[in-house]
Regions:
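Multi-bladed beta-propeller domains
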Residues: 21-37, 69-87, 116-132, 162-167
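Loop-centered beta-sheet repeat module
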Residues: 29-77
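Conserved beta-propeller blade repeats
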Residues: 1, 8, 33-54, 82-103, ...
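Alpha-helix-centered segments that form part of catalytic cores
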Residues: 2-30
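Loop/turn-rich, solvent-exposed surfaces of beta-rich toroidal or solenoidal domains
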Residues: 98, 103-115, 126-167
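Hydrophobic beta-strand positions in blades of beta-propellers and related beta-sheet-rich domains
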Residues: 16-20, 64-68, 91, 112-116, ...
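Short, conserved, GDST-rich strand-edge loop motifs in beta-rich repeat architectures
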Residues: 1-13, 54-63, 105-108, 147-161
Length: 167
């Protein structure tokens, strides 16, 4: 597919909001309102007060993709400080809520890494190097992971520098 629209939308700096909706009462509350492409909000399992979300766009143009915020709009914080040429993606909560796991990879390198962020301690740590795959999910307590295969990423502006050689 052509990700040109993805790039164009990023550069428009669209007005985006994170909103919670109480399905019983219909009440909606705006948590965050920005002229930045926000996406992929996910509540922390077993904790309705912590939400992960992303600054969306081509990964090589976004300064820091993954963020956390409290449900009341306070304590906005980066999950990971990106290194130059680093992309971080495919974030998900460990189902027990202990950490947000994600994939990290560097421009010009084949290796990908599983990392996790503990929202209670603000600790971001390397778990292990992984085969080139894309979407991951873990079992309940995060000791087993499953992932699908992946080729070269297309969600970056500079696709030539992020080639993955598959077997």
């Amino acid at each position: 597919s052509d990700w040109k629209i993805f790039l164009e939308f990023y550069h428009k700096n669209p007005r985006c909001r994170l909103i919670t909706i109480d399905l019983e009462t219909g009440n909606a509350e705006v948590i965050l309102d920005r002229n930045t492409w926000l996406g992929h909000p996910i509540f922390r399992p077993n904790n309705n007060d912590t939400i992960a979300f992303c600054h969306e766009g081509p990964h090589d143009l976004v300064d820091a993709r993954m963020w956390m915020i409290n449900r009341d709009g306070t304590n906005e914080r980066k999950v990971h400080e990106h290194q130059p040429g680093e992309s971080c993606t495919h974030e998900f909560w460990i189902p027990d809520g202990s950490a947000l796991a994600y994939v990290s990879y560097m421009k010009g390198q084949q290796q990908r890494y599983i990392r996790k962020y503990n929202p209670d301690t603000d600790e971001d740590s390397l778990v292990m190097e992984m085969p080139a795959c894309s979407h991951l999910m873990s079992n309940h307590n995060g000791i087993l992971y499953v992932g699908d295969g992946s080729g070269s990423p297309v969600d970056v502006k500079d696709t030539c520098s992020y080639k993955i050689e598959n077997d």
